Amino acid sequence: MRKLMLTGGLLMLAGCAGFGLPRHDPTQAWIDLESHQEDTALLAFEVDNKAATDKRYFEVQPGSHELTVRYQFPVQPTNIGPDAQPLWRDCQMNVKFNDFNAGERYQLQAGNIGFRPWAKLYDQQRKVIGQGTPAGCQRS
């Protein structure tokens, strides 16, 4: 019985290992997503007003693109009032960049200050090359 459980566990781990991020296509630009704070979610939403294929990253042709991300975060009680509970916000932000290059990796980071979300796009040298503009928020 132990061998069966061990074998089953190893097979499950091996199966999960295949569900990571796909290989980066060198003819495309790759944009990693990273939320800057705990208890948040940053998801790829749209590229040029078309639904993103995978919510974990963007992969785009070289050139100009507008990326839309969905950022979910809690507003802490210290920003609301003394007896308040955290308030969850669900926001979209657009980041436009005119010069994505094939084979390069970019990073899109998001965070919030109180009720206001922010997003920044970085190149491989960690230089800020784009800023997010709000595209609407709602309570979630």
Identify the residue ranges that each predicted region occupies.
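Sec-dependent bacterial lipoprotein signal peptides
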Residues: M1-A17
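Short loop/turn and low-complexity linker motifs enriched in small/turn-promoting residues
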Residues: C16-S140
